[in-house]
Each structure stands twice: as structure tokens, then as C-alpha cells.
């Protein structure tokens, strides 16, 4: 039986486009499955591969100069990938190839190719901070929280780091400057821009086009190194993707957020790069200390945390005029846990217009209760807070994604109480609400504290879902 389509019954232009792309006459099945992809296929077919090769070579020279590969090898890898469809007969794989090639031909130049042209002048905007003056205070605060007991029998997952991280970091520094409306950074690198004594590994980023950027970067690395690069999506980390090499070594990761979320994230401008406001980052750190795993990290490397904490404390002292005199007033706010229903009630009336906050430890339960309230004014800040917030009838409803530490049976540990207070303050900052007095009291409540042992802790909310991935070598997309 003839598997080829009848030339007399098919639109000649569409058939010709598909035939040119595949390098062969398509089967009937291939034709009917691919004809809706004609526009993308056309873009791929007319794409100037020579210019693309030149851009990749320039990226290699600027950011990957120490990688031992020749210009001819790069060209061969690129041309091989753009002709891969001619040797592929599986429809699913053909769709994957078309999708990934389409991303490259429509976005690479604007996203990564632009990094090879002359950059705008860097606007120096650094302020001299006296971080040293905060080191002793930070050490005292962290010492009182260094209460985790490490279980030596616990098997920790290894986080293998690729040797390419330093190259990608160099690229990311330029990327953050060129794309500072759609990509901002946080974490150690952002604090390094304030305090050069901070050590950092990879660069932590939030952006509005994460998937496209990571696909383009994955191909750049593949074409330069020849390695198989895999993009993975983790179900319990919202809108998160990571690039790893074929040996499962971590290269870079990214959280994707909507543009409207990006617009409200507090940020500051340093050397043409936007970083998440260190005040906001400090609140996030205080919140994360409620997570038992983070306290275990603190016990393993307290000096790393001390450098970060001191930097952020100095920033808030300088920026907001915070006085560290130990006056904490009503901080941390009173917290009562309902362990059966997994809800913590925080008394907020001393600081805010809403009288209390109900912090749910199960996101699905919160979503259900919000529906029952028939309220449609909730704020979802995605991975920025990993939470939804709703204020209804003078009550805040929110999701708290970390563990709750207990200092005794039924008693919330002060570390978690401060974490919950910080979580509420994140909302205040994101919505331009009042937070400075509360921030001052919260930070002062961390001074001169004795260590309080952890009695127990709640479990984190279990997130459903499966891992997704893009395997470039095997032409597979699973999401």
C-alpha cells in the first residue's frame, strides 16, 4: 500500500513545506499530523543557520572561552540538530523537535544572542555599607536559632554542581543587565553586589520567561560542549525548572513568575541589575528558619549564614533607620496551633487592621475554605511567597509552606512564630502596606535570646504531581 499522500488531493504548498523540512515525501500520517505546524516549519526552514552559528561562536568566546571545543565542532552540532528531523519518523519526536527548534529560531537572538553586542554603560549605584558592625549582632541572633539536632543516619541528597556553573554565572551577570525588566536576582549573588565578601555558588533568579530562557541556554551549552542537557520540573516547587547535564550535575535553575507579580516585587538597582530588596530577603530568611531543614543547614555552616544575615541587617539599618535596642513590644505575635486541623492562628490586631491571621499548613484546605467564603480578592504571589493571601472580614487567610516547630506539646516555637510574622510582613511589603514598625519589633525580638530546644515539628504539606522534563537528545517533552 502506498503510504505517501496523493499529490493531486493535497494542497501543494503545504506538502512542499513539509517535504522540504523532512528531506523526504511525508507519509499520509506525517502530513496530516504536521500540516498544522506549517507556519513553525516555515520559520525553521528559512532560518539563517549561518548567523545563528556566528552568534553561538561569539557566546562561546565571551562566556565559555575555557571550554575546549572548535568552531567547526560547534557548527557541526548546530547543523546536525537542525537536520535531525530528516532521520526521525516518530510523530511525537517530530513534534518535540519542531517545538524546540521553533524556540531557538524565534527567541535565541533576542534572549542570548544580544549578549554578544556592546553593552550599555554600567551605572554605578553602590552604597558603602558597614557590614562589620552587624556581624556580632547577626552571630548572636543565629546562635539562639542554632537548635537543630542533626540525625547522622539521615541520608542527605547530594547536590552535584557542574563545572560549567562559573561560565553560566558570567553569562548570567550580563543577562541580568540586558534583561533587567524581565529577570531579577536574589540570594547570595545579590548580597555579594552589596558586600563583596559574600561567597556565592550559582545565581538565583526570578523571571517572566523562564522556560524559553532555559531552553535557549540548554542548547547553547549543548552546542558548545556536546553534552546532553536535560531540563527538569519539580512538582513541589512552583513554576521551577532546573538545567542539569547528562551526569545529573546542577547547572542553573529558575523560578517563573507572571509580569504582574514581577511588578510588585520590592527591588533595588545595583550596577544595572535589579535585585530583590534585601529587606524582603531578610524576611524570607526569617520565615525559612521555621523549616527544620534550614536549621540543619545553619548548624552545618553558621558562618555562611552569618555573612548573609549581617549584610541584610546593615541594609535595613541604613535604609529604614532600624535601631537595635532590644525593644520588641508585641513581637513575635501570639501564635496558637490547631494540630488536628493544621492551622495556626496569629493575633495581628496590635499591628494591622485585620485582627488575626489563619495560616493554613495544607494549601488544598485553604483553597477549599476560600471558595466557601465566596471571596474573589485573594492575592497569589506565586513562588515569591509560595502562598496565596486573602483578607476577608478582618481576617487574613494564607498558606504557610514550611514546617511549624514546637517548643513543647501544642506550643509554637518562637522561631516559627517569627517565621509566621515575617510571612505576614512579606504581604505588607508586596501590597505597599505598613511594615516598618513591625519589622523593627520583629528584628529586635531576635536579640538576646536563649536557645530553646525543638520538641517536635509538623510535617510539610505534601504536593501532588509528577516530575516533568525536556530531554533534548532523546526528543522527549514530559510536562
UniProtKB/Swiss-Prot annotation:
It catalyses: RNA(n) + ATP = RNA(n)-3'-adenine ribonucleotide + diphosphate. Gene3D superfamilies: Poxvirus poly(A) polymerase, N domain (1.20.1270.320), Poxvirus poly(A) polymerase, nucleotidyltransferase domain (3.30.460.60). Ca(2+) 2 binds at residues 202, 204, 253. Induction: Expressed in the early phase of the viral replicative cycle. Its EC number is 2.7.7.19. It comes from the Viruses. It is an enzyme of class 2 (transferase). GO terms for biological process: mRNA processing. Keywords: ATP-binding, Calcium, Early protein, Metal-binding, mRNA processing, Nucleotide-binding, Transcription, Transferase. The active site is at residues 202, 204. Ca(2+) 1 binds at residues 202, 204. Polymerase that creates the 3'-poly(A) tail of mRNA's. Belongs to the poxviridae poly(A) polymerase catalytic subunit family. Heterodimer of a large (catalytic) subunit and a small (regulatory) subunit. This is Poly(A) polymerase catalytic subunit. It comes from Camelpox virus (strain CMS).
Amino acid at each position: 500500500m502506498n503510504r505517501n499522500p496523493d499529490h493531486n488531493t493535497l494542497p501543494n504548498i503545504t506538502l512542499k513545506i513539509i517535504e522540504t523540512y523532512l528531506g523526504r515525501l511525508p507519509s499520509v500520517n506525517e502530513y496530516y499530523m504536521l500540516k498544522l505546524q506549517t507556519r513553525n516549519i516555515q520559520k525553521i526552514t528559512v532560518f539563517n543557520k549561518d548567523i545563528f552559528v556566528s552568534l553561538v561562536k561569539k557566546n562561546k568566546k565571551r562566556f565559555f572561552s575555557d571550554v575546549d571545543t572548535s568552531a567547526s565542532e560547534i557548527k557541526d552540532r548546530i547543523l546536525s540538530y537542525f537536520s535531525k528531523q530528516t532521520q526521525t519518523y516518530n510523530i511525537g519526536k517530530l513534534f518535540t523537535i519542531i517545538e524546540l527548534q521553533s524556540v531557538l529560531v524565534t527567541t535565541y537572538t533576542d534572549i542570548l544572542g544580544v549578549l554578544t553586542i556592546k553593552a550599555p554603560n554600567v551605572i554605578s549605584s553602590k552604597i558603602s555599607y558597614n557590614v562589620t558592625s552587624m556581624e556580632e549582632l547577626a552571630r548572636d541572633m543565629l546562635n539562639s536559632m542554632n537548635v537543630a539536632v542533626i540525625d547522622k543516619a539521615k541520608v542527605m541528597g547530594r547536590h552535584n554542581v557542574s563545572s560549567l556553573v562559573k561560565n553560566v554565572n558570567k553569562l548570567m551577570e550580563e543577562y541580568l543587565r540586558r534583561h533587567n525588566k524581565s529577570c531579577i536576582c536574589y540570594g547570595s549573588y545579590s548580597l555579594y553586589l552589596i558586600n563583596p565578601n559574600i561567597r556565592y555558588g550559582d545565581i538565583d533568579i526570578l523571571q517572566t520567561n523562564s522556560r524559553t530562557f532555559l531552553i535557549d541556554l540548554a542548547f547553547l551549552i549543548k552546542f558548545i560542549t556536546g553534552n546532553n542537557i536535560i531540563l527538569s520540573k519539580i512538582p513541589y516547587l512552583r513554576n521551577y525548572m532546573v538545567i542539569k547535564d547528562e551526569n545529573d550535575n546542577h547547572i542553573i535553575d529558575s523560578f517563573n513568575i507572571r509580569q504582574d507579580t514581577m511588578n510588585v516585587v520590592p527591588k533595588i538597582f545595583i550596577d544595572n541589575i535589579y535585585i530583590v530588596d534585601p529587606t524582603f530577603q531578610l524576611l524570607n530568611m526569617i520565615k525559612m528558619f521555621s523549616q527544620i531543614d534550614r536549621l540543619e543547614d545553619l548548624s552545618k555552616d553558621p558562618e555562611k549564614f552569618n555573612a548573609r544575615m549581617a549584610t541584610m541587617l546593615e541594609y535595613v539599618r541604613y535604609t529604614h533607620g532600624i535601631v537595635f535596642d532590644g525593644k520588641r513590644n508585641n513581637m513575635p505575635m501570639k501564635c496558637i496551633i490547631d494540630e488536628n486541623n493544621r492551622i495556626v492562628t496569629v493575633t495581628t490586631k496590635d499591628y494591622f487592621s485585620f485582627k488575626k491571621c489563619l495560616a493554613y499548613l495544607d494549601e488544598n484546605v485553604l483553597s477549599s475554605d476560600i471558595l466557601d467564603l465566596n471571596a474573589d480578592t485573594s492575592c497569589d504571589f506565586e513562588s515569591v511567597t509560595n502562598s496565596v493571601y486573602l483578607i476577608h472580614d478582618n481576617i487574613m487567610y494564607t498558606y504557610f509552606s514550611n514546617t511549624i516547630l514546637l517548643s513543647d506539646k501544642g506550643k509554637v516555637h518562637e522561631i516559627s512564630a517569627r517565621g509566621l510574622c515575617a510571612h505576614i510582613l512579606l504581604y505588607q511589603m508586596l501590597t505597599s502596606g505598613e511594615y516598618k514598625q513591625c519589622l523593627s519589633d520583629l528584628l529586635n525580638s531576635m536579640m538576646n535570646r536563649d536557645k530553646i530546644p525543638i520538641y517536635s515539628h509538623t510535617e510539610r504539606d505534601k504536593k501532588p504531581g509528577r516530575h516533568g522534563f525536556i530531554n533534548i537528545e532523546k526528543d522527549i517533552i514530559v510536562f
